[in-house]
């Protein structure tokens, strides 16, 4: 009877763990969408005074924010053009503006705690970010090269027709048999010079 109770206890514990009743960070949403961008939130304990928060995409460090207690909670960030951020009491939010499908990847946060001691470093929750492009964008990517190629073909065909018609028009006016003017035969100057040399 005892093994049965142990199995039930382990089963209930696993269910509570998977549903997030035991781990408080399981209900935390890491990604949220607003203003055409993605907000990636990384939570940390409220008691932390000095920290370094890094946002990773796979193994690449995208953003690194350092909060120090020195002169009025100074914040420094590496790569400020890419890393727009918002710092609150218990979270750092990084913003990805105008994401496209190439930025879909696994993102996670790494937290280094300096104060209160002891120094700790841990990886926080992560998640896979799927970014779907709209159907209109995909259709434009397909039809834009096709449309450009069709335009070039029509343009070339038009130029060839214009050249052909202009040559035909010019050629018909010169070789018109019903013209009142007759064509003159080309004069060969070599014959004259021979005759001039023979007579003298």
Curated annotation (Swiss-Prot):
Pfam families: V-set_2. Coiled coil: none annotated. Residues 1-20 form the signal peptide. Residues 30-133 form the Ig-like V-type domain. Disulfide bonds join 42-109, 63-83. GO terms for cellular component: external side of plasma membrane; plasma membrane. Glycans are attached at residues 23, 89, 123. Expressed on activated T-cells and resting memory T-cells. High expression seen in the thymic medulla and in the germinal centers and T-cell zones of lymph nodes and Peyer patches. Expressed at low levels in the spleen. GO terms for biological process: T cell costimulation. Residues 21-144 are extracellular. Keywords: Cell membrane, Disulfide bond, Glycoprotein, Immunoglobulin domain, Membrane, Signal, Transmembrane, Transmembrane helix. The chain crosses the membrane at residues 145-165. The keyword Amino-acid biosynthesis does not apply. N-glycosylated. It is a single-pass type I membrane protein. It is found in: Cell membrane. Residues 166-200 are cytoplasmic. Homodimer; disulfide-linked. Interacts with ICOSLG. Interacts with PIK3R1. Interacts with TBK1; this interaction is critical for the maturation of T follicular regulatory cells. Stimulatory receptor expressed in activated or antigen-experienced T-cells that plays an important role in the immune response. Upon binding to its ligand ICOSL expressed on antigen presenting cells (APCs), delivers costimulatory signals that enhances all basic T-cell responses to a foreign antigen, namely proliferation, secretion of lymphokines including IL10, up-regulation of molecules that mediate cell-cell interaction, and effective help for antibody secretion by B-cells. This is Inducible T-cell costimulator.
């Amino acid at each position: 009877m005892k093994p049965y109770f142990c199995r039930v206890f382990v089963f209930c514990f696993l269910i509570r763990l998977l549903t997030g009743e035991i781990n408080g960070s399981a209900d935390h949403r890491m990604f949220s969408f607003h203003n055409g961008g993605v907000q990636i939130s990384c939570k940390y304990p409220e008691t932390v005074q000095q920290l370094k928060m890094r946002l990773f995409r796979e193994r690449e460090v995208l953003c690194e924010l350092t909060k120090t207690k020195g002169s009025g909670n100074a914040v420094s960030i590496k790569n400020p053009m890419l890393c727009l951020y918002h710092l609150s009491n218990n979270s750092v939010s990084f913003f990805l503006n105008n994401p496209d499908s190439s930025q879909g990847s696994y993102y996670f946060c790494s937290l280094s705690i300096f104060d209160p001691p002891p120094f700790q470093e841990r990886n926080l929750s992560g998640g896979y970010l799927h970014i779907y492009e709209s159907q209109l964008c995909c259709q434009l990517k397909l039809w834009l090269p096709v449309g450009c190629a069709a335009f070039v073909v029509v343009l070339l065909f038009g130029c060839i027709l214009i050249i052909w018609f202009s040559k035909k028009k010019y050629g018909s006016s010169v070789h018109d048999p019903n013209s009142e003017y007759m064509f003159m035969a080309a004069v060969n100057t070599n014959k004259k010079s021979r005759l001039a040399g023979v007579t003298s």
